[in-house]
Regions:
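Iron-sulfur cluster-binding electron-transfer modules in prokaryotic oxidoreductases
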Residues: 1-197
Length: 197
């Protein structure tokens, strides 16, 4: 576990850019002082924010190269596990589906990575119609635009066939909470299945 604070994503979503930048700089400084080799993020929204740190600075800014160094050391937890041999793990037999969040498939450009791990673990995943579409959480969007956000959520849950599964998994904390507010089917972070092994 590394020292740091909020990645700054929520502040940035709310256009509190200076507050976000203060947090970003503090994180960069702390992590470089600690001499970290890798940052593994289980929250895809935080992961994409940290990977995008260089975009917050002009190339002439002294923080630009520091932000690039941190960005290059940041991996989603799926990137860490995708090449691991998981064949010896005994997975719980549960009928599940997976929601691929925008932050993982579009932001981090890692479409299908979690699905490939779940398939390796022995789960049959259906094709989700319009899987590329947002569930409506979108950072602070669900709070600032609740009506449209709920419409997007309801469409996503319909496409996930939420009432046909025992469990819905995702990689994004905001998506998890947002989807859970619209269904009785438990919604969990996909990495939680490893607790049951």
């Amino acid at each position: 576990r590394i020292n740091g604070e909020c990645c700054g994503a929520l502040d940035q979503h709310l256009s509190a850019n200076e507050t976000a930048l203060t947090k970003v700089k503090r994180n960069i400084d702390n992590w470089l002082i600690e001499g970290i080799d890798t940052i593994i993020s289980a929250a895809s929204g935080c992961g994409v924010m940290v990977k995008d740190y260089p975009k917050l600075f002009d190339k002439n800014d002294p923080y630009y190269s520091k932000a690039e160094e941190i960005s290059n050391k940041t991996k989603d937890i799926a990137e860490f596990l995708v090449n691991e041999d998981l064949s010896q793990l005994s997975t719980p037999k549960v009928k599940l589906n997976y929601h691929a969040p925008c932050t993982l498939q579009h932001g981090q450009q890692l479409p299908g990575i979690v699905e490939s791990i779940l398939i390796k673990l022995g789960y049959d995943l259906p094709d989700v119609p319009d899987a590329h579409m947002c569930c409506g959480s979108a950072g602070t969007y669900s709070t600032l635009q609740p009506k449209i956000s709920k419409q997007l959520r309801n469409e996503k849950l319909k496409n996930l066939d939420d009432d046909q599964f025992e469990l819905i998994l995702t990689s994004n904390i905001g998506c998890l909470l947002h989807l859970q507010n619209g269904t009785k089917t438990p919604v969990k972070h996909w990495i939680e299945i490893f607790e049951w092994l």
